[in-house]
Every structure is written in structure tokens, then in C-alpha cells.
């Protein structure tokens, strides 16, 4: 149904009226927040002026405590009021820019007049008229917008079910107090591009196509049964858009038990995280947690290794280890490349995961490796002594539990060592270097030991013993800290042991079928470990082994994980994520045709990823219609990818792609420069030159910069370790 000019004018007028009322409320609230803030500052400033402190008698003490409590309660009330008013003010400031995004007209059964209900991120009441101008998207009546098309509808309220008829469903895109898009629809459209299509077109066939696309996406958005939902979709089919709408829907439907910080999105790269934070529907909530898999690896392993990122690995694979870019090819270089490729395949597979699980079982009986406990270049406990102690425990005790027992034993051994070490000459030398503050703290401890009696350092032996313990405690602190973090376990040695010919474990039982170039794989792995470098294909197996031995740091608070571009994850990585989040559901979005890491992808077949939760708990949804590119582009690209005939193009016309073959790089660069100049003349503000590899991009930048008058952008976006890999928990791990 096409909107009339009269309807459009009425909606524009309403937006103006509503935003004006919100602006008035913002002004009032800003004044209120300012006054309350002044109250808080004044109360804090004169807090003790208003409190009478007299502890001379028990009665006076009680009155003093009551006076303090009363003043504290006044301060707490003002602070609560300030926090709540500031929170409301923040919502109103967002609301005034984009007051609502939906409208439904509803006639309750038995009534004659229809009610227009506008939905936004928060409710807004016109206090003079006593009427809600905007309803919160979480209000009971809002479910009509998400769950129904126009027609017979019903929604649940605390007082029972309300039935009636929805006569209109209208969607808006309002920014900066102006309506950008507006259209009537039968289904709720969440994708921005589809909104634009519906807003600009009155063609019935186009509306039918868009409605069909949204219904397909709704199967993804509203799926609430599958433990693992796999979405296989062509490029531009709206997988990510559907996933973001799915987040919105799940937060809405389970708003009483699911919050945004219990959802995690693993996105392809840090730039995508910024994009996602701007596209989530207007929920009035914080965004869900977002990270990249690389950032998580950096967070967990960055202190131990220089961790290779996936793009560096990919660059190596695509350039054949540099063989494709001018290097003189030799049989040794070719073999090195093939060996690395074989290692990537092998270490990314579930077969290698099974080997590590078997290796863990073997370590319960034999093969554990430990670092000796050292202090000031002195070996306190040898690695052999630690191995002996470890295998003295009951073999039925799990590895992580045995290590906890080892930790407690080691801390006890350090206490015994300290009693002997206290007599060493270096301790007296350190005592001489103690500051007056450290002497004073030791004196305070002595008073506590003496039960509060006034004491002095008259006894030299007592003084020396107390100060020596202070010195030893400080110097042993790093050793104790390392023990508490289980750093006495030689994890690098344990992982490397898998690749050593002579090892304390029987690898014949573990690795029955060795991959090609096994000897070269072993040599390269050990060499990288010795240099404190961890290739990307080793990062997840190393982390998995570390957690299998020391105890998994599972995150039980997260309830839903969304993996975008899942085709770029290996089977091993997906299995690790399942182990990391044991109580969550998972949504995996990907496209077999877009697997940039096809040498190690779980999406090379659907079966490995579907096997994570089993067929009973897994559902696969396939999207075939690509609507983000023109028909001509889709028809061109579907001729390149396997099974491309199944991809359906959208009815958007455009120019045909051109394939130009040149005889040499010089001709290529001249043609590119001419094409860029033409596009700039036509007014294009942003032009991208896409290459297969980073080295090709570097080459293109060097060649094109002298040929172009306009500046050619050049930026790198490396992975950043640290906070990016942290995943918050509502409850302790």
C-alpha cells in the first residue's frame, strides 16, 4: 500500500510535535540534574559539618552513629536521584533525534475507535494530556509489531490476553528529527537496504519480493529451538543483517532472563566491530559484547608468544610463501611451502583435536613436563622432583585437580625453603637497605604479635627475624605468584613433545596416520616454539592443550554466541568455542563460496560444524537470494563460484562488470590510474582498489601513487591485543 501525501504530511507534523515536547522535557530534566548534582556536591563538601561525633559515653556514641547514618542516607538518596535522572536524560537525548521506529493501529475487540501506537527505545508520556506519545518496544502491546501482520491479533498482559485487529503496520527511519524512510508493510523489515527499497518503490511485485526476503530472514531471526543454527547464504543475502535482527529479537523475547552482556559476537575483524555497534536496532540497551577470535587468542597467549594472525597466515598461503612474487623458486622452498600447508590442514582438523584429547589421557600416566622452581639462581625444586610428586597422586584424579594439589604443595615447600634461606648473608644485606617506612611497618606487625603491648626492637634476634621475613616475603612474591598461575607447568615443552621424535610419551598410539611432510612439520613447529613465536595454526591447539591440562576457563555466563563469517573458522576452532561457552546456543553465519581460509575451513563441508551439537540440535537454513549487488554483478559472480546457479539475483539493474586482461603490470597500472581518474571526475568520493594479497596491494600503492593527482589512501589495521579479547561475565568463572 502506497502512502498518500496527506499521510506523509501528518507523520512529519507528528514527528515535529513529539520532538518539541521531548526537547522541553530535556530542558526541564537538565535543570533538575544540575540542581541535584549541586546538592550532592554540597552534601559531600559539608558532610562532616552536619555530623555530630561524640564518643565519650555509650549514649553519645549511639547518637553519633545515628547522625552519621542519617547524613549518609540523605547523600545516597540524592546520588540515586542523580543517577536515575541522568539515565533518563540520556534516553531522552537519543529519543529526540529518533523518537520511534514503528507504528501499529489497533482496535481492541468490542471497541470502535482504533488506537495508534508508536514504538521507540523508551516510553514518553505527555503529562498534560495524560497520553503516551511513544511506547517502549518492550511493552506488552509492542509484541504486535514484532509478531503479527495486519489482521486478527492478540497480546498478553498481566491482566490477561487482549484480542483485536491490527489495521496498519508502518515503519520509519527517523534521524536528526526528520523522517528519512517511511512505508507500510505486512512484515517487520529489519534490513536497512530493504527499507530503502520499500520506501522508494510502490511496485507491487517489488514489495512481494522484499516481503519474501524478510520472511526468509525471519526463519533465522525467530528460530528459538536450535542449539546450533547454521546459516549458509550467498554473498549479499543478508546473513549478518538477519543475525543482528536475531539479537534484537532474542533480547526482546527473553528480556526477563537474557541481557546484552550475555551475548557475544565473534566478528571477522576489528573494523567490523565498529560497524556492528552502529547497526543494531534501536533497542535502548547496551550493545552485546564483540570481539575477534584473533583478539581472544592475543589476550590468552600474548604474554607467552608472538601470535601470528590469520591474515599473515593467509598471505603466506596465497603468495605460496613468497614464491609468486619474484622469488627464485627452488625445490627446497616449494617443499617448505607444501609442508606448511600440510601442517595447517592437519592442525586445524578435528583429527588433531582427538589426538590432543588422547595425549591428555596419556599425560595422566606419563610424560608430564615441569619447569624447575628457582630463586636467585638457586634451584629450590628440580623438574624431576616435580614429576615424581605429580605422579605420586592417585591416577584417578584429573590433571587440573592434581595441579591444584601440586600448587598447594609447592607453596608449602616455599615456606619451608624460606625458613632455611632466612639465615643467608644476602638477607642481612637487604635488611640494611630497608627504608624507614618498612621498619615502621615491621614495628606495627610486632605490636600485633605482642597483643597490642608497647614493644620496641630491643631484642636483636627478634628484630632481625622479623625484618628478614619481610625481605624474604617480598623477594619470594614473584615465585609464589608464578606458582599460583601454574607457570611451573612446562606448557611449551608439553606441546612441543607432540612433535619430538624422542619424547616421554608413546606417540605411536597417538599419531597413527602421519600427514605428508611430517618431519618438516615437526621441525618447523619446534623451531617456532623455541623463538617464542606461535603460528596461527598452532594457537588454538596450544590453547586447548593448556586448558585441558591446567583446567578450562569456561564462561558459563554467556548464553548465546554468534559467529559471523564462520566459513573462516577451522573445525578445531569451532570445537574450542563450544568448549569455552558450555551453556550457550550458537548461531554460525557463513558462505562456502566466501571461505578465504578454504585450506582449513569447517565450512568446506557443513557436516563438521553440524556435528558439534549433533543433528537433533542443529538446524541449517540456506539463503539463495543476493540483493546487495545488482543483477549484472550477481550473474557474473555466480558463474565463478561452485553451484552458483542456485544464487538468485535481485531485480536491481546496473552496468555489467568488465574483465580486462593486460600483457604486463605497467599496462595494468596505467589502465587503473585512468579508471580512477575517470571515477573521480564523475564525482565518486571513495574508490577502492581490491587485490588478492597484501603484497599486491603494496605493489599497487607504490605504482599508482605517482600516476594519480589525488592522494591514494594507505592504512593498516592490525589486530590489537589486550582488552579486545576480554569477555565479561556476570558471574565469576
Model-derived features: where do they sit?
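Conserved motor-region signature of P-loop NTPase helicases/translocases
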Residues: 118, 123, 165-268, 272-278, ...
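Short hydrophobic beta-strand that contains or immediately precedes a catalytic carboxylate
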Residues: 213, 562-563
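Extended, charged low-complexity regulatory segments
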Residues: 1-210, 214, 218-219
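Short, charged/polar micro-motifs that form catalytic or ligand-binding hotspots
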Residues: 90, 94, 199, 203, ...
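Alpha-helical nucleic-acid-binding subdomain
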Residues: 253-561, 568-576
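P-loop NTPase Walker
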Residues: 1-44, 191, 196-326
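Conserved helicase motor core of SF1/SF2 NTP-dependent helicases
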Residues: 278, 282-286, 291-295, 302-316, ...
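Short, flexible loop/turn elements at secondary-structure junctions
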Residues: 108, 235, 267-270, 567, ...
